[in-house]
């Protein structure tokens, strides 16, 4: 099967012709062999029949002898005359010999009459008449094949004879035919059969050629069309001939339908590939723009993170400053306490003013010195309040920049700024009071020498100074509480800002990831564009 599949269909069809011709030749040879045998058999049968007929002549005359009509000699002579005259097929004759063997009568060669035949042999050394006698003795009748020259010729040719023993007279009657005419007849029939066989072979060759052409040519066209598609020519507009109703026509119809469907599919794929290329271009452009926007967003988030870090540092500075202010306030409170103690001491000294003016003057001078120092402390407090106000303003600005997450911090910053403003106002009032105290102390120093009334007024002023110091002490206590609140709020704000900073850093990381994803999308868009171009190039191979 695989060997046949390695041959083309046309060759296989011609192989059928070769096998058919070979079988025809074999059949012809067998038939010729049969004909050859039949010709020989026909000759032999014909000879047997004519010999049996001639033997009937002998039986007739022997019957006359038996009836007493003729003597044996007369009956034999008449029988010999009749048999001598018998002919068939123009020149064929009968002879008679006895069991001697001795020739009784030979019409074609009278010289053999009364001759001893035992020494006669054919060119092959075959003792013809001895074999005839032996056959007659054994079977009474039968064929004998040998070679014998034709009448008037010296060259022996093949001959077949049939002999029959006529027992009443002891004669053997026989007749033979030359088989060279059988060979001629066989050659004629061989020639006729060969001509018929050649004619049949030529007719079969013509039929096979027409059939092979009707099969191979459409198949070659189909194979060529398939090969063109497979090799890259890809002409999808090609159609095969579909005239007919055989399997090859059905194959062509199926191929045409397949090519038509493939043509439609490839056409749709070309349109889809073109649309895909355009979409890939749009995707690449959008991805590139998204990448740029993501990069800008990442840069802005880095800037926001930097600003938040600065705010964190500023808040930490505010916390430190608030802590320092609290320390300064504690120092001021201690100083106010000392001032109160000094005022009380001054009151005691004023009560003893009548005892010693010098001690009162000294006390007043001490009071003036303390007032001066308190003024310095108040300057520091005023400076701290101004810085706190400035820091609160900056914190409010940064909180406003932080948006919704910094709204609470903005409220706290506004409260701190208001507290700082009130602290500054109170400090200014205290400073004014200190200045007034100093002026009164100076007036008391000047007036202490002139009038006890002045001393009383000084005592009164000292009491007022004590009350003022109490008020200052209360204010300082309030400032200390406010500073503690500011420090606590600043600490909380620091935690909030740190949380904002972490969120901003996380957002910056997400922005970077978004930028990376946008870059990957851009790369994917470029790769998709290349793939769509390759697909378009592949589809351009098909002509639709």
From Swiss-Prot:
Principal subcellular localisation of the protein: membrane
Domain HAMP: 213-267
Entry keyword Repeat: no
InterPro entries listed in its UniProt record: Chemotax_Me-accpt_rcpt (IPR004090), HAMP_dom (IPR003660), MCPsignal_dom (IPR004089), sCache_2 (IPR033480)
GO annotations of cellular component type: plasma membrane
Pfam families: HAMP, MCPsignal, sCache_2
Protein name: Methyl-accepting chemotaxis protein McpP
Provenance organism: Pseudomonas putida (strain ATCC 47054 / DSM 6125 / CFBP 8728 / NCIMB 11950 / KT2440)
């Amino acid at each position: 099967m695989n060997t046949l599949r390695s041959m083309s269909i046309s060759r296989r069809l011609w192989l059928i012709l070769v096998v058919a011709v070979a079988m025809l030749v074999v059949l012809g040879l067998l038939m010729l062999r049969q004909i050859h045998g039949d010709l020989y058999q026909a000759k032999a049968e014909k000879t047997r029949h004519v010999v049996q007929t001639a033997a009937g002549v002998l039986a007739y005359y022997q019957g006359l002898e038996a009836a007493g009509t003729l003597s044996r000699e007369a009956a034999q002579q008449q029988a010999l005359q009749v048999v001598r005259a018998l002919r068939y097929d123009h020149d064929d004759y009968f002879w008679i010999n006895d069991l001697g063997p001795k020739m009784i009568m030979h019409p074609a060669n009278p010289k053999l009459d009364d001759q001893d035949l035992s020494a006669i042999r054919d060119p092959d050394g075959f003792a013809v008449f001895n074999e005839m006698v032996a056959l007659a003795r054994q079977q009474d009748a039968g064929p004998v094949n040998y070679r014998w020259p034709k009448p008037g010729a010296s060259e022996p040719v093949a001959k077949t004879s049939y002999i029959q023993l006529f027992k009443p007279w002891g004669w053997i009657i026989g007749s033979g035919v030359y088989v060279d005419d059988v060979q001629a007849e066989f050659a004629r029939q061989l020639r006729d059969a060969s001509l018929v066989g050649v004619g049949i072979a030529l007719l079969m060759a013509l039929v096979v050629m027409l059939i092979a052409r009707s099969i191979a040519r459409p198949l070659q066209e189909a194979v060529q069309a398939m090969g063109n598609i497979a090799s890259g020519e890809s002409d999808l507009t090609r159609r095969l001939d579909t005239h007919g109703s055989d399997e090859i026509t059905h194959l062509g119809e199926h191929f045409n339908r397949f090519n038509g469907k493939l043509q439609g599919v490839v056409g749709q794929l070309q349109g889809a590939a073109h649309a895909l290329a355009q979409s890939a271009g749009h995707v690449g452009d959008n991805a590139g723009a998204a990448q740029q926007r993501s990069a800008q967003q990442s840069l802005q988030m880095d800037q926001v993170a930097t600003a938040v870090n600065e705010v964190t540092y500023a808040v930490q500075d505010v916390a430190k400053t608030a802590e320092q202010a609290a320390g300064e306030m504690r120092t001021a409170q201690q100083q106010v306490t000392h001032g109160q103690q000094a005022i009380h001491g001054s009151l005691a000294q004023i009560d003893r003013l009548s005892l010693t003016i010098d001690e009162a003057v000294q006390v007043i001078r001490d009071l003036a010195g303390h007032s001066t120092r308190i003024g310095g402390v108040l300057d520091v407090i005023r400076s701290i309040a101004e810085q706190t106000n400035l820091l609160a303003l900056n914190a409010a600005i940064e909180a406003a920049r932080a948006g919704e997450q910094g709204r609470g911090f903005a409220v706290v910053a506004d409260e701190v700024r208001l507290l700082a403003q009130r602290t500054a106002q109170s400090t200014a009032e205290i400073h004014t009071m200190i200045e007034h105290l100093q002026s009164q102390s100076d007036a008391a120093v000047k007036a202490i020498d002139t009038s006890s009334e002045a001393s009383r007024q000084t005592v009164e002023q000292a009491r007022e100074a004590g009350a003022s110091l109490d008020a200052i002490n209360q204010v300082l206590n309030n400032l200390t509480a406010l500073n503690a609140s500011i420090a606590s709020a600043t600490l909380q704000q620091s935690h909030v800002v740190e949380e904002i900073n972490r969120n901003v850093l996380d957002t910056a990381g997400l922005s970077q990831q978004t930028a990376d994803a946008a870059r990957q999308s851009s790369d994917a868009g470029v790769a998709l564009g290349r793939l769509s171009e390759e697909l378009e190039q592949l589809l351009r191979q098909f002509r639709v």
